[in-house]
From Swiss-Prot:
Name of the molecule in the record: Transformer-2 protein homolog alpha
Phosphoserine found at: S2, S14, S82, S84, S86, S96, S98, S236
Biased composition, class Gly residues, residue ranges: 215-230
UniProt cross-references to SMART domains, sorted A to Z: RRM
Designated gene of the protein: TRA2A
Family membership noted in the UniProt record: Belongs to the splicing factor SR family.
Keyword Cytoplasm on entry: no
Domain of life of the organism encoding this protein: Eukaryota
Pfam families with a match to the protein in the record: RRM_1
PANTHER family: TRANSFORMER-2 SEX-DETERMINING PROTEIN-RELATED
Length: 282
């Protein structure tokens, strides 16, 4: 019986030994499986984290680039605006300067109240019958004269009611202005002052140069002369001299507006007429 027990015991040990090597690899396999799974998960997580970081960085770079470009464009536009504003005063000055004779006449209005002393005196408010000889007799009492010039109308040949007296010395012109200002000459009270222009305005003829719109005095022959179409006679300096030029300018402006309307107005008028006379459709 002892031999049989020993054999049985040896068989059990051999079975247990044969089972144990087969069991251990299963554990090793499970360990290897768990180990292989966990690094793959870690690598995937790290990759996704790195991707999200790279995306966030690229987005932040894009946003920063956009902000930079916006701020840069805004600064450039602000610079352009500031440059354009800096040129506006010079542009306004250029536009304000006009080369018309009316603007040149208006430039003297600021210093007309207090002109600078000079050798040229302007005599205003003269009668139509006062000549250069009469003025020379009056003003030669105060000192030697270099010239006397009565301003006549180029077309009619009549006096325009003012003249220029030229002295050789300023002291004589001062004395003449103080004493002759307000005196009566040929029934008219004259005004004497320092002249600003020192000569007559040649562009202003003194009468209306356009076509006569109403009947008036008949025109002269080849010598030129005659009335200008029912105009008013005024002898004072401001009426016959400077203001007559303004009246002529206003008449010309009115005549131009009356004969040649603006193209926008003509278009609007033609459209309104075509619409008003168009037949209605029922």
């Amino acid at each position: 019986m002892s031999d049989v027990e020993e054999n049985n015991f040896e068989g059990r040990e051999s079975r247990s030994q044969s089972k144990s090597p087969t069991g251990t690899p299963a554990r090793v396999k499970s360990e290897s499986r768990s180990g292989s799974r966990s690094p793959s998960r870690v690598s995937k997580h790290s990759e996704s984290h790195s991707r999200s970081r790279s995306k966030s960085r690229s987005r932040s770079r894009r946003h920063s680039h956009r902000r930079y470009t916006r701020s840069r464009s805004h600064s450039h536009s602000h610079r352009r605006r500031s440059r354009s504003r800096s040129y506006t005063p010079e542009y306004r000055r250029r536009r304000s300067r006009s080369h018309s004779p009316m603007s040149n006449r208006r430039r003297h209005t600021g210093s007309r109240a207090n002109p600078d002393p000079n050798t040229c005196l302007g005599v205003f408010g003269l009668s139509l019958y006062t000549t250069e000889r009469d003025l020379r007799e009056v003003f030669s009492r105060y000192g030697p004269l270099s010239g006397v010039n009565v301003v006549y109308d180029q077309r009619t040949g009549r006096s325009r009611g003012f003249a220029f007296v030229y002295f050789e010395r300023i002291d004589d012109s001062k004395e003449a202005m103080e004493r002759a200002n307000g005196m009566e000459l040929d029934g008219r009270r004259i005004r004497v002052d320092y002249s600003i222009t020192k000569r007559a305005h040649t562009p202003t003829p003194g009468i209306y140069m356009g076509r006569p719109t109403h009947s008036g005095g008949g025109g002269g022959g080849g010598g030129g002369g005659g009335g200008g179409g029912g105009g008013r006679r005024r002898d004072s300096y401001y009426d016959r001299g400077y203001d007559r030029g303004y009246d002529r300018y206003e008449d010309y402006d009115y005549r131009y507006r009356r004969r040649s309307p603006s193209p926008y107005y003509s278009r609007y008028r033609s459209r309104s007429r075509s619409r008003s006379y168009s037949p209605r459709r029922y």
